[in-house]
Amino acid sequence: FVYSTKIGNNTSLRFVNFGFNYHKSKNFNRLFASGGNLTGGLSQTWQMANMMGVYMDEVGVPEADTGNELDEIYNSNNPYDVNRYDAPYLGVMGIRTNLLGVNSENKLIGWDGLGNKYTSREEGGIHQYDFNVAFNFQDRFYLGLTLGAYDVNYNRSSYYTEDVAYGADEGFYELNNWFETRGSGIDLKLGTVVRPFEDSPFRIGFAIHTPTWYNLSDYHSADLYSDVTFNYQDGTSEQLKTEEFTPDYVK
């Protein structure tokens, strides 16, 4: 959209033009899916175990107290309190859904993966709005200014599930993650064209584009559901179904 206003033929300022433009500068829409058998017992639960192992090393938990630390996190009213634990949330969720344990050597252990499935959906984009004003001085000096405003919206949801086993024990778990980025941005573009010689078509110009300054906020949360059965040597078994939600994180 352009609106042109003629000021006069004999005035220094001949024209003032106003413009507006909109376009979607970035499209985030995407779908992804995968799945299959897991070779070599590969499982995300071992990633959870490694995360918590690194955390315990950093905070100085003695190896002999690994089991006690797991019990404390498992029974905590708020294990996501960064002032108390500051532990990786995926590892905490693994503890509280019976996906992590401790072996006879006080080492954190996970499960052996049998098969998995993963789906991801991304939506959103960056919407750009340009507001323009341009001046024509004596048909020889042209000045333009554009203010760019950006609206950012990005959403991603993912689902991951694994069938797992460890010795005679077996089960599965499902992990849902939600992530959102919202915000806005702004930039400026300034340009000029000069015709230095009145009787010549020769022109020279230059332009300045500022970086785009963004103010963004991230929101993320997760949900982990597990259904595992422990088969004991005396012939009895115990089925545990657990669901764990994280609080909404804002950054």
Language-model features, listed with the residues they occupy:
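Outer-membrane beta-barrel porins/channels
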Residues: S4-K251
